[in-house]
Amino acid sequence: MTKPAVQKNGLHPRNRHRDRYDFPTLKHSYPALIPFVTVNAYGDESVDFANPEAVKTLNQALLQHFYQIEHWEIPDGFLCPPIPGRADYIHHLADLLAEDNRAVVPREASVLDIGCGANCIYPLIGYREYGWRFTGSEINPIAMKAANQTIEANPGLNRAIRLRRQKSSTAILAGIIHKNETFDAVMCNPPFHASAEDARQGSQRKLHNLGLDKRSPLNFGGQQDELWCEGGESAFIGQMIKESAGFARQCLWFTSLVSRKENLPEIYRALEAVDAEKVRTIDMAQGQKQSRFVAWSFLDTAARTRWLQKR
């Protein structure tokens, strides 16, 4: 008898990954996954999430099966993102845009992804789900090369996704948004940790949660610019907020993930300091993990509606 699908608590209603992974279907669709699938102590098929190669292959299977991405590779040591959570950001952002567009998610919206990474995951999902056009910024040349290889290896992506190199280590939006250029939304998954030591301790906590020895050579992935920056998440978002004021009429919504809830008061103060017209906090959840993104606009409701009607 086929087991009933068990839904993952809290994921967006349109998220394709609300049910537990259907490994029989994924193995049939993407045979390279077969060697990594085993039966766990509960009698369910799964993969070893402590094995970076297994996690990457699972992502390849999910991208191929759900999003028709036939070729996706990331270099060793780069972040391998959990796709369900990344998809949730896209779907909640779509709802935010729909609020100003008579409850209709705009097609072919123009979106800027700050720090798209080697995985380029937000542009891939956003384009396949909603036909959005993406500009991805990236400071790491190796990551940018890998993302470009994915774009060129999959037919049609190069007409929807373009990448721009961020040449300044201190800028986020500056140098990426061109004069007279507009975006319907800006999205960002900022570096989480405040130092390399914080990042190392975060990896050790993951090892502990997986029941592994701290001396394990496990590589969870993530380059310096992906994992940490001076001052951590709060400082990065604060800089993004300051820069956003200079592009107040070029972007409808600015958004950023906020991993640490305790950073919200400081973020709200920064938004008040730049006179943001509208601020929203969108809560998200995946099982026991709680997350959110903060969105802000310098346009009032009427101006935001006019913006989308003129697209």
Swiss-Prot record:
Which GO molecular function entries does the Swiss-Prot or TrEMBL record give? Answer: 23S rRNA (adenine(1618)-N(6))-methyltransferase activity
Q: Which InterPro entries match?
A: METTL16/RlmF, rRNA_lsu_MeTfrase_F, SAM-dependent_MTases_sf
Do you know which Gene3D superfamilies this protein is assigned to? Vaccinia Virus protein VP39 (3.40.50.150)
- Tell me where in or outside the cell this protein is found: Cytoplasm
What Enzyme Commission number(s) apply to this enzyme?
2.1.1.181
Chaperone listed as a keyword: no
**Catalytic activity as recorded in UniProt:** adenosine(1618) in 23S rRNA + S-adenosyl-L-methionine = N(6)-methyladenosine(1618) in 23S rRNA + S-adenosyl-L-homocysteine + H(+)
Which keywords does UniProt give here? Cytoplasm, Methyltransferase, rRNA processing, S-adenosyl-L-methionine, Transferase
Superkingdom, taxonomy of origin: Bacteria
Gene Ontology cellular component terms for the protein in this record: cytoplasm
Q: What class of enzyme is it?
A: transferase
| Database matches in CDD domains | AdoMet_MTases
Give one GO biological process term.
rRNA base methylation
> One Pfam family of this protein, by short name?
Methyltransf_10
Predominantly, its location class is cytoplasm
Write down the SUPFAM superfamilies for this protein, in alphabetical order: S-adenosyl-L-methionine-dependent methyltransferases
Family to which this protein belongs:
Belongs to the methyltransferase superfamily. METTL16/RlmF family.
Q: What does this protein do?
A: Specifically methylates the adenine in position 1618 of 23S rRNA.
The entry's protein name is: Ribosomal RNA large subunit methyltransferase F
* Biological source species: Pectobacterium carotovorum subsp. carotovorum (strain PC1)
